[in-house]
A protein has these predicted regions:
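Glycine- and small/polar-enriched repetitive beta-structure motifs of secreted/surface proteins
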Residues: 1-199
Length: 199
């Protein structure tokens, strides 16, 4: 194990191959192994979770037993506790996530409010920002599916595509502002800039 910084890795007992750099980085870890924490309080609450990578202030800071997570950015996956297999890159990306598994978020506040939703992909500033419990959504583009809360299995590609959608499911929007006004309707397909924008 390698620990650099005040209180970094102070509780490690049998955990192996950990790297903790920064004040209180990995400071609660006991048996967790193969973790990398770089930044103030990164992976600070981790006890047995393995393997995780956290780079940034409080990245994966609340994680206790979750494993296979990667968080890069200020507060990325900051509230994750037990969830596995998430990747969050960007400031506040997936910050509220607690138990959602197998999600990928790339961009400032992407999937920010996700708590228990699984298998979502968000790429872009505020993509899927309000998603909480919904599963299997794909959003690519700034503010794509940004208002979505519980709508599932939607695909939005393009800036503000399906950006007003809240509970609608099984929609496909390809193009800037495609299906932009849709909120609760299901099973729509829109291809092209502003296609079905008023739907």
């Amino acid at each position: 194990n390698v620990a650099i910084g005040d209180e970094a890795g102070t509780a490690i007992t049998t955990g192996d191959n950990n790297v903790a750099i920064g004040y209180t980085a990995l400071d609660a870890n006991t048996t967790g192994a193969n973790n990398t924490a770089v930044g103030y309080a990164s992976l600070g609450a981790n006890t047995t979770g393995t393997p995780n990578t956290a780079v940034g202030r409080s990245a994966l800071g609340a994680n206790t037993t979750g494993g296979g997570n990667t968080a890069v950015g200020d507060l990325a996956l900051g509230n994750n506790t037990t969830a596995d297999g998430n990747t969050a890159v960007g400031r506040n990306s997936m910050n509220v996530n607690t138990e959602g598994h197998s999600n990928s978020a790339l961009g400032d506040t992407a999937l920010y409010r996700n708590t228990t939703g699984d298998s979502n992909t968000a790429v872009g500033f505020q993509a899927l920002d309000h998603n909480t419990t919904a599963d299997s959504n794909t959003a690519v583009g700034a503010s794509a599916l940004t208002a979505n809360t519980t709508g599932a299995t939607n695909v939005a590609v393009g800036d503000t595509a399906l950006d007003a959608n809240t509970t609608g499911s099984h929609n496909v929007a390809l193009g800037v502002s495609a299906l932009g006004a849709n909120t609760t309707a299901d099973d729509n397909v829109a291809v092209g800039r502003s296609a079905l924008a008023a739907n």
